[in-house]
Regions:
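Haloarchaeal acidic low-complexity proteome signature biased toward cell-envelope/secretome components but also
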Residues: 1-36
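Short helix-initiation/N-cap motifs at beta->coil->alpha
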Residues: 71-82, 94-97, 179-200, 210-211
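Pocket-lining segment of extracytoplasmic ligand-binding domains
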Residues: 190-281
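A conserved helix-loop-strand patch within extracytoplasmic ligand-binding domains
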Residues: 115-186, 245
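Ligand-binding "clamshell"
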Residues: 102-112, 172, 215-229, 286
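Short, polar/charged alpha-helical segment
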Residues: 46-73, 78-79, 100-105, 165-174, ...
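Secondary-structure end/capping motifs
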Residues: 250-327
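Short, well-ordered beta-strand elements
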Residues: 36-47, 67-72, 151-155, 185-186
């Protein structure tokens, strides 16, 4: 599979006083005491952009917190939003759009860390890649329709998801194309559904993150990159770490984000081991170790912690989330982010 030409990128917990911590955390899923016996519930998804969770879990970084961590795996963002609304989640590592939905619904939470930036690629069938002319995108898709008798179909995550919004931005803002006129967009049920749809040639292309592109290459499927997010949306957001206010206003916030940053540093220095951790948590049947390792070499695997690095892209996503009816208003950076936790780290 053709790869885009881009350079590959780049214990301490201060416990709060018992009474103050209990007061500040009233209403939190697991009220965090100072004796380490209580529970912090962390939602995550089995996707590469949640790599920090895999490392924190497998390297024992959660043990540095004065609270036990209960990880809950979800297949999609909307399910995490529902769990957040029910008060079942303290911290969630998932997409920026569902994080915005949580905030827009008035649930007391903010993004305290980013997990990754620019992790998306636009892939198309090899036949279309030969036709693709970025200077005449409408003509390229019309040629496909003329030769195949059908409109080009992108299959990606459901409407309003990070992959979906990135695809719409690429089509509309970058190439002045209209979904439903020049191309069709089909919402699939997640990464595995997208992969199967491509393998069965139900879709002609996709907007997707690792490890799907690497799995496509490993299985010799006829798809390749025609663009990557870094080339048209620098600082593109994806998975983030959303924290409930009851946790965010306690010392636990800094402790958690400190371990998140530590995990990001570990990933940078130990990419193969981090890949093995991802395979262990996700499951080797779904993510074989060799595929996980190869995906780490992808230009889409850009792991970060500083939330400011995705601020510009988040503004674009906020506009699209509102336009698609996922939020009632266009959220500002101030409404979405709390930079103080990261900025306060030693």
């Amino acid at each position: 599979m053709t790869r885009p030409s881009r350079e590959l990128s780049r214990r301490e917990y201060l416990a709060g006083s018992g009474a103050a911590a209990l007061t500040g955390l009233a209403g939190c899923t697991g009220v965090l005491g100072s004796d380490g016996s209580d529970t912090l519930t962390v939602a995550y998804m089995p996707i590469y952009p949640d790599m920090q969770y895999f490392v924190m879990d497998q390297e024992g970084y959660f043990d540095e917190l004065d609270a036990s961590v209960e990880g809950k795996q979800f297949t999609d963002g909307p399910s995490i939003v529902k769990a957040y609304a029910s008060g079942d989640i303290d911290v969630a590592m998932f997409g920026i759009v569902p994080a915005m939905i949580v905030v827009d619904r008035g649930i007391a939470a903010k993004v305290v860390a980013a997990n990754i930036e620019e992790p998306m690629g636009i892939l198309a069938h090899d036949r279309f890649a030969e036709m693709w002319d970025p200077n005449d995108p409408a003509g390229s898709f019309e040629q496909w329709r003329s030769e195949t008798g059908e409109r080009f179909t992108f299959g990606t995550f459901p409407e309003g998801s990070v992959p979906d919004i990135l695809l719409r931005y690429w089509l509309v803002d970058e190439h002045d194309l209209e979904p439903g006129k020049h191309v069709d967009i089909v919402g699939a049920g997640g990464a595995n559904a997208v992969f199967q749809g491509l393998a069965n040639e139900e879709f002609d292309g996709t907007s997707i993150m690792e490890p799907v592109p690497t799995k496509i290459a490993a299985n010799d499927l006829p798809y390749q990159f025609i663009d990557v997010a870094a080339d048209f949306m620098p600082g593109q957001p994806a998975a983030v770490t959303l924290m409930a206010d009851e946790v965010r206003d306690s010392d636990t916030a800094a402790a958690f984000v400190r371990q998140h940053r530590r995990a990001t540093e570990f990933i940078s220095s130990n990419r193969e081991t981090a890949a093995e951790h991802a395979s262990a948590v996700v499951g080797e049947q779904s993510l074989p170790v060799d595929v996980a390792r190869q995906a780490m070499e992808s230009p889409l695997s850009n792991f970060i912690t500083d939330p400011r690095e995705i601020e510009s892209g988040t503004k674009i996503f906020a506009e699209y989330a509102n336009r698609l009816g996922k939020t009632d208003s266009t959220l500002s950076a101030e409404q979405v982010f709390d930079y103080s936790v990261y900025d306060g780290l030693e």
